[in-house]
Amino acid sequence: RGSXLTILPLRNIRDIFYVG
């Protein structure tokens, strides 16, 4: 899931983890 992708803004990180 959103590994790595933490490079994006916190706002997008939340969507990444949710969509993960």
Swiss-Prot record:
GO molecular function terms noted in the UniProt entry: aspartic-type endopeptidase activity
Major localisation: secreted
Tissue: Expressed in chorionic epithelium (trophectoderm).
Keywords carried by this UniProt record: Aspartyl protease, Glycoprotein, Hydrolase, Protease, Secreted
EC number(s) from the headed UniProt entry: 3.4.23.-
Transmembrane segments annotated in the record for this chain: none
This protein's name: Pregnancy-associated glycoprotein 61C
Domain of life: Eukaryota
Modification after translation (UniProt): N-glycosylated.
Sequence similarity: Belongs to the peptidase A1 family.
Keyword Protease: yes
Coiled-coil annotated spans: none
Keyword Secreted assigned: yes
Localization, UniProt: Secreted, Extracellular space
One cellular component term from this protein's GO annotations in UniProt: extracellular region
GO biological process: proteolysis
Enzyme class, broadest EC rank: hydrolase
Disulfide topology: none
